[in-house]
Design a protein with these regions (language model features):
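Polybasic low-complexity intrinsically disordered regions
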Residues: 29-102, 106, 150-153, 166
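Basic, amphipathic alpha-helical segments enriched in Lys/Arg and hydrophobic/aromatic residues
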Residues: 2-9, 13, 17-18, 89, ...
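N-terminal polybasic/positive-inside topogenic patches
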Residues: 23-26
Length: 166
């Protein structure tokens, strides 16, 4: 039996709510953040959706706490600069002690758009999700519905890759 070692990439994406008529002002959604954990190919492993008033660092702790026991073969995690800080690192060490975290940051001298290594895989996954009509804009009132549609879109992508290997 061979040991499987998986590297994952985690990033967040902000999504603004759709401008749909609501029955009351209490249901008005201002925005949500989607944190996804993908493998090195860009396929979804895990997703968490929460209100946009939570910082990326705290959202990363939410993602890691919901991962407990799910991926024992996850050994390396590439994250973007928003997931830095002692709180995130201590939570990662407590939840997944075998996990090694590497922060992919932009250089200070870079001007304009720059493709970052490893980070483009997550951004490409968000672009794939953007092709799905229900994920192009946030139409969901509940976060669990948004996660369900992320998973459905990921299943659709995986099936399309299996059926069309070209």
């Amino acid at each position: 039996m061979r040991e499987i070692r998986l590297s994952g990439l985690m990033s967040g994406d902000g999504r603004r709510g759709a401008l749909l008529p609501r029955p009351s002002s209490t249901l008005q959604i201002k925005g949500k953040k989607r944190h996804v954990l993908v493998d090195t190919v860009g396929l979804l492993l895990h997703a968490v959706v929460h209100p946009a008033d939570i910082q990326d660092r705290d959202g990363g702790v939410l993602v890691l706490s919901s991962l407990f026991g799910m991926y024992p073969f996850l050994f390396k995690l590439f994250v973007d600069g928003g997931y830095q800080g002692p709180q995130f690192y201590s939570a990662a060490a407590a939840i997944l002690p075998q996990l090694s975290i590497e922060v992919v940051k932009r250089s200070d001298q870079a001007k304009g758009f720059k493709v970052l290594p490893k980070r483009w895989v997550v951004e490409r996954t968000f672009a794939w999700f953007g092709r799905c009509r229900r994920l192009a804009k946030d139409f969901e009132n509940l976060s669990r519905n948004a996660v369900a549609f992320l998973r459905l879109a990921s299943i659709r992508l995986m099936l399309r890759r299996l059926c069309n290997p070209s």
